[in-house]
């Protein structure tokens, strides 16, 4: 029983790092992957495992050699919409910083192998309230070109939920479906 308890406690202390992905392929180059038109599908799950909302995102990305700009158009399951523009600077061979209107300060991130990890603080609209939250965001590129994203959201240091997203290049969506990708209606 003591050994089982020790193993459980040691597993709780393990944290995923960028180093865990450094030799994984295909290599994720953020500015290459996000240049052009993409479609994302996602959901937000609260800390109790309840899906609170689902959404699609139509994304247009441009890279000028130093700055990646992402224009994101969200459509939520209740038919509400939101526009967000991320401006992401490449600050080193594998490092990035980004800003968007509701971000508090800068988002800081590192690409490693097939992954991208970044953290940031954000003003999140929740009903008629605005909550200050922290995102711990991991993206992992799959061999089929799908980019999976898991973002854990914290408020006052307590996990309030998780965002799950799946990104695909719009051309890949059109090829698979035989027609142009469309936002949920």
Please place each PLM-identified region on the residue numbering:
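N-terminal helix-cap/turn-to-beta initiation motif at the start of protein domains
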Residues: 21-37
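A short, Trp-centered hydrophobic/proline-enriched beta-strand micro-motif
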Residues: 34-42, 149
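Central antiparallel beta-sheet cores of small beta-barrel/beta-sandwich binding domains
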Residues: 41, 45-126
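Surface-exposed interaction patches
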Residues: 106-109, 115-127, 131-138, 142-151
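Amphipathic hydrophobic-ligand
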Residues: 51-57, 130-135, 159-163
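C-terminal motif of bacterial Sec signal peptides marking the signal peptidase cleavage site
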Residues: 8-11
């Amino acid at each position: 029983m003591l050994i089982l308890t020790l193993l459980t406690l040691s597993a709780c202390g393990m944290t995923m790092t960028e180093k865990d992905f450094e030799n994984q392929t295909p290599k994720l180059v953020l500015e290459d992957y996000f240049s052009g038109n993409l479609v994302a599908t996602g959901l937000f799950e609260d800390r109790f495992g309840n899906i609170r909302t689902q959404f699609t995102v139509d994304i247009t990305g441009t890279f000028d050699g130093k700055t990646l700009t992402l224009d994101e158009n969200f459509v939520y399951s209740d038919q509400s919409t939101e526009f967000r523009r991320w401006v992401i600077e490449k600050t080193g061979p594998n490092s990035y910083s980004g800003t968007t209107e509701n971000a508090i300060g800068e988002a800081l991130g590192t690409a490693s192998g097939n992954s991208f990890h970044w953290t940031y603080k954000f003003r999140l609209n929740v009903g008629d309230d605005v909550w200050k939250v922290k995102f711990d965001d991991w993206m992992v590129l799959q061999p089929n070109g799908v980019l999976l994203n898991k973002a854990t959201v914290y408020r006052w240091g307590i996990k309030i939920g998780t965002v799950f997203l799946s990104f695909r290049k719009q051309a890949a969506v059109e090829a698979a479906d035989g027609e142009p990708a469309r936002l949920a209606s």
